[in-house]
Amino acid sequence: MNKKAIFTQVSQLEERIGELHRELGGLKEQLAYLIEENHFLTIENEHLRERLGEPELEETEEKEQVTKERKPFVGEGYDNLARLYQEGFHICNTHYGSLRKNGEDCLFCLSFLNQD
């Protein structure tokens, strides 16, 4: 193989890698959007179910008490991690503490923040 053919092949490979990188970035954005949309739809679903089945007052009070007992308290640590993420740092175990590139969302960090 001559040098020109090798150079051409490397250039073509570089272009394909660039295209794949752009495509992967687009898929990552779509996935982040879908995760966020799923989270909001889940919340909306819960609210609609609550409205549809509005039980008697006593049952509602009992359910609220059980719900309060089940829900874990969101503490100061969670707030600190959310603040760090908003400031542009990773909070996932994979890249913890490093800066997020170009302020892009990290799916691992988002899944950590959206845990129930």
UniProtKB/Swiss-Prot annotation:
Relay the cofactor remark from the entry. Binds 1 zinc ion per subunit.
Encoding gene per record: yabA
The family assignment reads: Belongs to the YabA family.
Q: What does this protein do?
A: Involved in control of chromosome replication initiation. Inhibits the cooperative binding of DnaA to the oriC region, thus negatively regulating initiation of chromosome replication. Inhibits the ability of DnaA-ATP to form a helix on DNA; does not disassemble preformed DnaA-DNA helices. Decreases the residence time of DnaA on the chromosome at its binding sites (oriC, replication forks and promoter-binding sites). Tethers DnaA to the replication machinery via the DNA polymerase beta sliding clamp subunit (dnaN).
What are the BP-aspect GO terms?
DNA replication
Q: Which residues form the signal peptide?
A: none
Q: Which InterPro entries match?
A: YabA
Report the protein name in the record: Replication initiation control protein YabA
- List the subcellular locations: Cytoplasm, Nucleoid
Q: Which residues bind Zn(2+)?
A: H90, C92, C106, C109
Report which superkingdom the organism of origin falls in: Bacteria
A Pfam family recorded for this sequence: YabA
Per the UniProt record, which residue ranges are transmembrane?
none
Q: Which GO terms describe its cellular component?
A: nucleoid
Sorted UniProt keywords: Cytoplasm, DNA replication, DNA replication inhibitor, Metal-binding, Zinc
Q: What is its main location?
A: cytoplasm
Which prosthetic group or cofactor does it need? Answer: Zn(2+)
| Assembly and interaction partners | Homotetramer. Interacts with both DnaA and DnaN, acting as a bridge between these two proteins.
